[in-house]
């Protein structure tokens, strides 16, 4: 089974405008509300690709109920811990000539609530996949990802971590199955400018040396790189298409990687297939108004790699 964790999920209020004039009344040309959060995005894309999974984390208030209802409508199973106070945050995504995001803080998460989540995670079984994605709210210890991996290190799970800076570096001693920094985040970790795929490979290898089993690095329009635990190195240019929405592309890449790996059941071509699926799923979401569908991913896969 696949599980995703979202400490601070959201409802994303997406507004389309021709332009934004600060200090004046602005009227939208369209709007919609979508489930949001990196772990939530991974769950929804996995479901779109045909992989059952369960979204875990925290919700609160009426917005939390709306979030759970929207996930049910999309066929995504969830088992959130309901907080006693506050409300699940609403993030505003403004799509005009430039994209602007206004993200809410979200509810406070108590130590008792966090312990309930830890106990839930301790019921996972050998071979399960756990995705830890996104930032950690200020009300929680910033060691939460590391604490989870430490508590689960003997359970033989495949844990995927999509986080930045210390949140990512601190989990490396616990040998995450896969990590997915982008090229800018990779440069931030080492205090360098990443200029090309050779640089990506150089510094991604350092993350492997620190414990990461597989390092997948997204490079937006410049493609992606995977350093696999079997010593293989994969590079790809970005698929061709018109970018309509950058939100969720990285999360979609994570979902695609997991799906591609599971399709081959860890066989000889598992990492190649995982990489190619990740690249195509991330791009398919970027080329779509919402998150990628299975049909969009399959079409882009054939177009990019010449096979299904």
Q: Where are the model-predicted features located?
A:
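Substrate-binding N-lobe of the ribokinase-like
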Residues: 27-87
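Short beta-strands and strand-loop turn motifs
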Residues: 101-103, 128-134, 162, 180-185
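Conserved phosphate/ATP/ADP-binding segment of small-molecule kinases
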Residues: 143-230
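Alpha-helix C-terminal capping segments
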Residues: 44-52, 95, 260-265
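Conserved phosphate-binding/catalytic loop of the ribokinase/pfkB sugar-kinase fold
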Residues: 83, 93-126
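Positively charged, low-complexity intrinsically disordered leader regions
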Residues: 1-23, 32
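Short beta-strand scaffold segments in enzyme catalytic cores
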Residues: 90-94, 224-227
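Conserved phosphate-binding/catalytic region of the ribokinase-like
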Residues: 197-308
């Amino acid at each position: 089974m696949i599980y995703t964790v979202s400490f601070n999920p959201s409802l994303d209020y997406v507004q389309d405008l021709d332009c934004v004039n600060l200090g004046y009344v602005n009227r939208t040309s369209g709007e919609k509300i979508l489930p949001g959060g990196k772990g939530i995005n991974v769950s929804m894309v996995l479901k779109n690709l045909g992989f059952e999974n369960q979204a875990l984390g925290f919700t609160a208030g009426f917005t939390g109920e709306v979030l759970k209802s929207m996930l049910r409508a999309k066929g995504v199973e969830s088992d959130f811990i309901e907080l006693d106070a506050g409300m699940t945050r609403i993030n505003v995504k403004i799509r005009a000539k430039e994209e602007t995001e206004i993200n809410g803080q979200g509810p406070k998460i108590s130590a008792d609530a966090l312990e309930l989540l830890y106990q839930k995670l301790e019921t996972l079984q050998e071979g399960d996949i756990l995705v830890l994605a996104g930032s950690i709210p200020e009300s929680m210890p910033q060691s939460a990802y590391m604490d989870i991996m430490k508590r689960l290190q003997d359970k033989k799970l495949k844990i995927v971590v999509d986080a930045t800076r210390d949140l990512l570096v601190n989990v490396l001693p616990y040998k995450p199955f896969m990590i997915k920094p982008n090229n800018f985040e990779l440069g931030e970790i080492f205090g360098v400018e990443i200029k090309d795929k050779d640089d990506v490979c150089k510094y991604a290898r350092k993350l492997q040396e620190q414990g990461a089993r597989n390092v997948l690095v997204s490079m937006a329009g410049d493609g992606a790189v995977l350093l696999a635990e079997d010593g293989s190195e994969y590079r790809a240019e970005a698929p061709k298409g018109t970018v309509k929405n950058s939100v969720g592309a990285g999360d979609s890449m994570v979902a695609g990687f997991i799906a591609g790996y599971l399709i081959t059941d860890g066989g000889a071509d598992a990492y190649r297939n995982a990489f190619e699926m990740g690249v195509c799923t991330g791009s398919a979401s970027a080329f779509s108004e919402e998150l990628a569908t299975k049909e969009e991913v399959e079409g882009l896969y054939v177009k990019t790699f010449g096979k299904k």
